[in-house]
């Protein structure tokens, strides 16, 4: 049967197999098996063809054939990415026959596409007015697209790329990177040169701006900030205003943290009309509905996290917000929840004491206090309650509430646990008020009040692109950190929101959050285990260099552009740096913080320098990087590998993920072809496959196979250098509440500020319908049980009696695993069954 292909203009032409084969051959250039793969893809493609197939369907069919072979060799992903890139090039630039012609087309069309974006009122007219477009066009390098994986190309094109008013794509990837660079240099004296410098870094995936910046930079709606943190006040006008603000910030793609701790409890009196309050829950449900009504950038639902202090009288209902059962009008289906926990509560859990819940109307100052001041005032209110001088309160056991929090965490992954006293005591910008909450992803820690909606602007260094010749390039990391801080500082003067309190706070504090991603990627390339001392020292050293360079650059920018307005009176002005905050927290808490204090760089010189001024109130925060990590083609944030082979579902579709580092190591050992089917059969788990050496198994333990104390130790080592916080996902195999209590207590003891999602290992797995397996074969190996140490080996961190490695390590290093506390008596008690 003859097959005809329908072209874009509606005409038909005979299917040309040779033309398709040449396209496939071009996409396999430089790959080891390119000749065999051309034949394989072409033969598998023939099965999918039909008469009348469109050119778009044909392009998609070739890509899908390549993708279905990724499980056999991750290099097929490169083939798929190249094929997709070619379709994007053709639609935006037209046909081409060589890399040289492609580069020429990039340069020829660039100014024309920028002008079209301006004419269609999509792009800022200053992109034409302020820049030497010809010079920028000559700087474009389409070869950088080779760094993108297939999922990165799809994510960049579908989620972040600019579309014309008629829906057609305006940007190829290199136009996208240059548009971002231009949009972040509008305030530079030499915008063209600086844009090229930013472009070089981002197009090489060395660092990436966060999502809102990628969507809106260079456009007529420059809402570039990523995180907004606000507090709802206890009056009807401010509740209504907060709802309005959430709508506008959501429209602009911002993620939101919102504290409801000040709202009076259900049943609390309202004097203006002689009735009683419904409490915060109905207002939270209303805002939850707003998140669905106003999409972020027209692409997905709004995103928000509610925060509540756990002394609030309505906290038990807050715990139920994410439950599937119950009154739907007292549930939040879209918004997340997090609990704001004090040291006082943790100590009462530890000592098995009572915990009192109050109506904020009667204890209105508690919300503004932290540390010792909070504990003293809380004890005063406890006495008042017992004396009958407080109208509404409830007494429970602290351990029972902690148990309830963890059970809710098991069943719904909410509320996330965040520690308010750790956050406030470690803040270097503490002169501008109390920090009442974190943000959507728990990495931002900024003060806020009725007149200030805190704003943070994010970027992340891709560690994978700072690894070469078997080692980390620390000089390159420092260079990236400096340029990223300058870029983020520019962003603050360019971004605009529709909330005046946010714009005011942004200018007064100039907060930025530079983080990292790809940590697990480089750990694997180095052959380390995630739960090893080498891994802990690595993140320690990386973050020390990032921190030093970022702080030093901000001090330089202060000399060039002036210090941020609220600098005077901050701990920066006293010459303190993030490392110094550990001692401040320790002094307030009254117990040692179990974190290593090793240093490598000349911090005394930097302490002296920061006294002279800082351009930014904050500089560092490690975001989850779930989306930009896909573009960067690396592991997100500090997270371990979820699995060696798994299907990832995103807003752009489903994608098969195969760990290229593992495949490369197994290919070098000559056993990939032998063990491939066993890995597929075990759903990416290599621990029970006898043919794989133990050292490889140690390197490639996945999230549920690692000790959760390793996640905490990595976070604690990174946190000592970070002035804000870390989105620290947790992965647990156990459902034992005793284990869970011990784990989260260990996080608090190590000075970790926040945790993020809790992922529980599924009890059951689905049958693999696409994998042929011999079920008579039993994989060797035994499953590790319990949490007695890191991977069942010797403790990875020196015991408390061991000397610190430097003179600055004046506190004992943490033990690899906690004392056998077993959850204060909850050991063996299951949560959600």
Question: What is the predicted function of each stretch?
Answer:
Residues 1-833:
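Extended catalytic cores of very large enzyme megasubunits
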């Amino acid at each position: 049967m003859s097959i005809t292909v329908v072209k874009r203009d509606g005409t038909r032409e005979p299917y040309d197999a040779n033309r398709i084969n040449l396209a496939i051959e071009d996409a396999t250039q430089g790959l080891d098996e390119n000749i065999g793969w051309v034949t394989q893809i072409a033969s598998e493609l023939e099965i999918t063809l039909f008469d009348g197939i469109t050119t778009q369907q044909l392009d998609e069919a070739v890509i899908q054939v390549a993708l279905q072979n990724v499980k056999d060799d991750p290099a097929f992903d490169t083939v798929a990415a190249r094929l997709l890139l070619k379709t994007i090039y053709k639609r935006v630039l037209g046909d081409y026959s060589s890399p040289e012609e492609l580069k020429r087309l990039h340069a020829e069309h660039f100014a024309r596409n920028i002008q079209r974006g301006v004419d269609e009122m999509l792009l800022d007219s200053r992109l034409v007015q302020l820049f030497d477009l010809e010079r920028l066009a000559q700087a474009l390098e389409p070869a950088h697209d080779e760094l993108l994986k297939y999922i990165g190309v799809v994510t960049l094109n579908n989620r972040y790329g600019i579309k014309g008013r008629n829906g057609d794509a305006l940007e190829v990837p290199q136009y996208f990177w240059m548009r971002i660079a231009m949009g972040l240099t509008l305030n530079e004296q030499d915008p063209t040169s600086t844009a090229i410098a930013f472009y070089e870094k981002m197009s090489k995936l060395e660092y990436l701006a966060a999502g809102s910046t990628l969507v809106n930079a260079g456009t007529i709606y420059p809402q570039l900030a990523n995180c907004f943190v606000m507090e709802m006040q206890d009056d009807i006008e401010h509740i209504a205003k907060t709802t309005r603000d959430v709508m506008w910030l959501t429209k602009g793609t911002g993620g939101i943290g919102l504290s409801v701790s000040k709202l009076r409890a259900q049943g609390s009196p309202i004097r203006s009309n002689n009735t009683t309050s419904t409490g915060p829950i109905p207002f939270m449900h209303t805002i939850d509905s707003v998140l669905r009504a106003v999409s972020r950038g027209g692409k997905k639902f709004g995103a928000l996290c509610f925060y509540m202090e756990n002394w609030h009288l309505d906290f038990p209902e807050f715990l139920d917000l994410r439950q599937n059962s119950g009154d739907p009008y007292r549930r939040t289906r879209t918004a997340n929840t997090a609990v704001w926990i004090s040291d006082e509560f943790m100590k009462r859990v530890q000592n098995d004491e009572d915990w009192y819940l109050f109506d904020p109307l009667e204890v209105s100052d508690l919300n503004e206090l932290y540390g010792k001041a909070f504990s003293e005032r809380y004890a005063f209110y406890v006495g008042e309650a017992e004396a009958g001088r407080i109208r509404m309160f409830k007494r429970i056991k602290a351990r029972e509430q902690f148990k309830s929090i963890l059970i809710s965490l098991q069943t719904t992954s909410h509320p996330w646990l965040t520690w308010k006293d750790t956050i406030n005591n470690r803040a270097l910008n503490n002169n501008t008020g109390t920090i009442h909450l974190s943000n959507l992803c728990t990495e931002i820690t900024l003060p806020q009040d009725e007149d200030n909606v805190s704003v943070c602007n994010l970027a992340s260094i891709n560690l994978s692109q700072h690894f070469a010749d078997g080692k980390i390039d620390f000089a390159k990391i420092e260079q990236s950190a400096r340029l990223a801080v300058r870029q983020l500082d520019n962003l603050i003067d360019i971004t605009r929101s529709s909330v005046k309190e946010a714009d005011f706070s942004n200018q007064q504090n100039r907060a930025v959050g530079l983080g990292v991603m790809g940590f697990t990627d480089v750990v694997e390339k180095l052959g380390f285990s995630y739960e090893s001392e080498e891994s802990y020292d690595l993140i320690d050293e990386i973050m020390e260099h990032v921190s030093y360079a970022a702080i030093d650059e901000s001090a330089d920018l202060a000399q060039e552009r002036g210090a941020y307005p609220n600098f005077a009176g901050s701990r920066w002005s006293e010459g303190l740096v993030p490392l110094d905050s550990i001692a401040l927290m320790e002094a307030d808490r009254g117990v040692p913080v179990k974190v290593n204090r090793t240093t490598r760089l000349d911090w005394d010189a930097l302490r002296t320098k920061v006294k002279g001024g800082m351009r930014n109130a904050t500089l560092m925060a490690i975001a989850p990087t779930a989306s930009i990590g896909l573009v960067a083609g690396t592991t997100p944030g500090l997270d371990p590998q979820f699995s060696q082979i798994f299907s990832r579902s995103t807003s752009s579709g489903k994608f098969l993920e195969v760990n290229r580092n593992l495949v490369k190591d197994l290919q070098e050992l000559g056993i990939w072809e032998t063990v491939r089917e066993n890995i597929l059969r075990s759903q990416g788990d290599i621990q029970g496959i006898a043919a794989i050496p133990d050292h490889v198994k140690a390197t490639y333990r996945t999230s549920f196979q690692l000790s959760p104390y390793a996640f905490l130790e990595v976070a604690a080592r990174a946190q000592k250098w970070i002035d804000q916080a870390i989105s620290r996902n947790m992965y647990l195999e156990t459902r034992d509440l005793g284990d869970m209590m011990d784990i989260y207590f260990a996080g608090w003891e190590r000075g970790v500020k926040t945790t993020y999602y809790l992922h529980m290992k599924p009890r059951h797995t689905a049958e693999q319908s696409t994998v042929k397996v011999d079920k008579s074969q039993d994989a060797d190996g035994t499953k590790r049980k319990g949490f007695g140490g890191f991977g069942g080996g010797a403790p990875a961190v020196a015991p408390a009696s061991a000397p610190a490695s430097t003179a600055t390590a004046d506190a004992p290093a943490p033990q690899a695993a906690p004392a056998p506390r077993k959850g204060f008596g909850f050991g063996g008690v299951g949560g959600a069954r």
